[in-house]
Amino acid sequence: MSLNFNQKNAIELINGPCLILAGAGSGKTKVIINKIIYLINNCQYKPGNIIAVTFTNKAAHEIKVRLAKHLNLLQIKKMIISTFHSLGLEIIKKEINTLKFNSNFSLFDERDQMMLLKKICSKSIKNDTKLLKKLVFMISFWKNKFLTPLQVQLSAQSNLEKDFAFFYKQYTFHLRKSNILDFDDLICIPTSLLKNNQIIQNRWQKKISYLLVDEYQDTNNSQYELIKMLTNVNSNFTLVGDDDQSIYSWRGAKPQNLFLIKKDFPNLKIIKMEQNYRSYGRILKAANKLISNNLHYFKKKLFSNLEYGNKIKVIIGKNEKNEAEKIADKIIHECSNDIMQYKDYAILYRGNYQSQILEKTFLKKNIPYDISTNSSFFSRPEIKDLLSYLRLIVNPDDNHAFIRILNIPHRQIGLTTLNKLEELASKKNKSLFQISNDIEIKKILRERTVKKIKDFIYWIKKIIKLSLLKEDIILDKIINDIKYELWLTKILKEPKKIKTSINNIYTLSNWLKEMLRGNEFEKPMNLLQIVKKMTLRDILEKKIQINEIPKNRVQLMTLHSSKGLEFSSVFIIGMNEGILPNIKSINNDNIEEERRLTYVGMTRARKELFFTYCQTRIQYGQKLYTAPSRFLFELPQEDLQWEKDDYLDAFHTKEKKI
């Protein structure tokens, strides 16, 4: 184990609160892993009293895999190494009686949330996508500020604010009635419980001998409050973060939390990790120069003992097509001469729309590529269908699961019937499953329709009974009983799509069985726990690739998606004003986050870094002349190699006159 001076200090500082300012490529994961090992082997901490919190399941899994080389599997299983939301779920599960929730609650994802709000909102809001998205944002904002619907109603002033407050109240009522929690509840409910119940707070603080939090700069208000509730001024904990890599303010992240922790914990010790083990010196010099234009709570400057490296190239296209072709030609030249492999390259961009021209060009020039999208394995229709069946089995009051599967496959139960059921269920304050068993449905529905509903309910009850005895066969039983593969074949028609979807359902089935059995890192789980975990994973992960095998392909992804990754050669494309920084950030005077995003992209590169932009773009059918990004001029010009550009010549002429 080779550690530098600051890494060693960060690992061995155990007593009291500690903040590690870990620059890009400085080995933060290595420090987190070695600190856990040090706590157990050198300081005699019990694994069951150590909690490590990350932001993604992938990061949590990586920590477990790397710990397995040094600790035994029983020790790893005893630890809680999870995301914030999984930790919140664990607290809710343990304190379920105090919270007075039913233990078989379901979790809501974003699609469920939108579906419910469209159902309860007025036409003026549900038909206006912008307003509906604003309402979703406001509900999340209020929850993270720990504001109840009543508090929001009392402070509402405008008619829109009053409407939003009313729908927030309705939304909360529907969730509780259906025994459902949403994403924000997983942090806000346990935090509120710990705040308002000293006995429970003391118990959890006693349980946690040591807390570690990764990517601390990405915490929002409620996550920071949860950290405070799980610790006290004398607690032992380590937070690892980097204010220069805070790129998620749009989803509530507050880099100011790095400053607040110093205020709330006066005895906080700060350790800086500035040695970068990834990038050549020239890349780091440019990244340091760029980020120095931001205001900082803590000063930090990355350095490297690696070689200095070649100049950073600035490639200029006449238009978007020419920009993409120049990138493709550069990659083809280096790969055909065995200088590089396709997998050594990453193309990073601000928005997903920028990948379209690249894909078209790469296909034309036969360049193999993989594209990172925002789709999750669990958000695919066939997986959502089967998860909804499982959700209804573990929580029959889950109305949204009921609605999704009622006609999958077709049972000839129409929308009119469903509306009548919902109306009666609302009137009698029952779930759709409960009302389907009610004798009164005979008064509002035809006899033939009643029979179809009764048959469906009878079958669900049989599956529920079977699930109590044989959880491992339950998904296969559902797939076979409803003839789901046959139904997919009928609706998808295209052989390739059919094959992909059927492979996906077998992947889900195999994964379910593995989770029931447990594996080297995870304890066996029951069906209820698995359904919650899978739903939560869908919400948390932008992309999940099961059994991912590295392929010799160029990687295309957004700058946000690139965080935590590294590549030999990186292209950051679309370096134009209005794109990076994007127009919204320019108008809202939020340039600093765009600069941090560019910094993150630059520090993904190990050996080579390229910036590209184009002189003209087509927007709404109009040809527009576009200026190079201001960020290019904030870089050390002696380390850049520019292609000739008339705009740049004009810029330098103007600069000399000044």
Swiss-Prot record:
Substrates-to-products reaction catalysed: Couples ATP hydrolysis with the unwinding of duplex DNA by translocating in the 3'-5' direction; ATP + H2O = ADP + phosphate + H(+)
Q: For this chain's UniProt record, which GO biological process terms are given?
A: DNA replication; recombinational repair
Matching Pfam families, A to Z?
UvrD-helicase, UvrD_C
**UniProt EC number:** 5.6.2.4
Residues given in the record as ATP binding sites: 22-29, 278
InterPro entries according to UniProt: DExx_box_DNA_helicase_dom_sf, DNA_helicase_UvrD-like_C, DNA_helicase_UvrD/REP, Helicase_Rep, P-loop_NTPase, UvrD-like_ATP-bd
| Keywords in alphabetical order | ATP-binding, DNA replication, DNA-binding, Helicase, Hydrolase, Isomerase, Nucleotide-binding
Presence of keyword Cytoplasm: no
Q: Which residues form the UvrD-like helicase ATP-binding domain?
A: 1-280
- Give the source's domain of life in one word: Bacteria
Q: Name one GO cellular component term.
A: cytosol
Tagged with keyword ATP-binding: yes
Q: Where is the UvrD-like helicase C-terminal domain?
A: 281-564
Q: Recorded GO terms, molecular function?
A: 3'-5' DNA helicase activity; ATP binding; ATP hydrolysis activity; single-stranded DNA binding
Entry's CDD domains? DEXQc_UvrD, SF1_C_UvrD
Q: Which family does it belong to?
A: Belongs to the helicase family. UvrD subfamily.
Complex and partners: Homodimer.
Q: Which NCBIfam families match?
A: rep
Biological role stated in the UniProt entry: Rep helicase is a single-stranded DNA-dependent ATPase involved in DNA replication; it can initiate unwinding at a nick in the DNA. It binds to the single-stranded DNA and acts in a progressive fashion along the DNA in the 3' to 5' direction.
Protein name (record)? ATP-dependent DNA helicase Rep
> What organism is listed for this UniProt entry?
Buchnera aphidicola subsp. Schizaphis graminum (strain Sg)
Q: Which gene produces this protein?
A: rep
